[in-house]
Amino acid sequence: MRFWGSFLLVVILDRISKAWVLASFLPRESRSLIEGGLYLTYVQNRGAAFGLMPGKSWLFFISALLVIMALVIYNWRSKASPLEALSTGLIAGGALGNLIDRYFYGFVIDFIDLGWWPVFNLADSAIVCGGILLLILVLLDGKREERNA
């Protein structure tokens, strides 16, 4: 349930936030939330994370689809811990959010701008947070196995 809960929450919040950006901003329009620190800037990202490899949308679309399918199968077939399910749900939900953008628009809608980092979105944040949590879980599990060996 944690997988599907985090998965659906990420997809829903991502879609709502991007719909608001599309309705409220012109491309490249920026508004300050916290002067010098946080802006909302509408960017059409045609590449991968941070705008890398522009023009390869088909590659990212297929990759995201494979990741989502693998994570759904993993959670369906394994006895993932609640934190594993949460982390993989965040990753899969973020991947689906960006996949939906690529399918309907041919680009990903990015809008969170820290001023010193490439512009990103809620789906990207979910992927990163889920990935970090999963990495921590793997590292902790490895240390536990070393102690038990």
Swiss-Prot record:
List locations, semicolon-separated: Cell membrane
Q: Membrane-spanning residues where? A: 53-73, 89-109, 119-139
Q: Which GO terms describe its molecular function?
A: aspartic-type endopeptidase activity
Residues annotated as signal peptide:
none
- One Pfam family, short name please? Peptidase_A8
The pathway this protein participates in, as annotated, is: Protein modification; lipoprotein biosynthesis (signal peptide cleavage)
Q: Which GO terms describe its biological process?
A: proteolysis
EC id: 3.4.23.36
Q: Where is the active site?
A: D110, D124
Membrane topology label: Multi-pass membrane protein
Instruction: Give me the reactions it catalyses.
Output: Release of signal peptides from bacterial membrane prolipoproteins. Hydrolyzes -Xaa-Yaa-Zaa-|-(S,diacylglyceryl)Cys-, in which Xaa is hydrophobic (preferably Leu), and Yaa (Ala or Ser) and Zaa (Gly or Ala) have small, neutral side chains
GO cellular component annotations of the record: plasma membrane
Name the predominant localization: membrane
Alphabetic keyword roster: Aspartyl protease, Cell membrane, Hydrolase, Membrane, Protease, Transmembrane, Transmembrane helix
Q: Which domain of life is it from?
A: Bacteria
Q: What class of enzyme is it?
A: hydrolase
Q: Give a short account of what the protein does.
A: This protein specifically catalyzes the removal of signal peptides from prolipoproteins.
Q: Which family does it belong to?
A: Belongs to the peptidase A8 family.
Q: What is this protein called?
A: Lipoprotein signal peptidase
Organism (species): Syntrophomonas wolfei subsp. wolfei (strain DSM 2245B / Goettingen)
- Taxonomic classification: Bacteria, Bacillati, Bacillota, Clostridia, Eubacteriales
Q: Which gene encodes it?
A: lspA
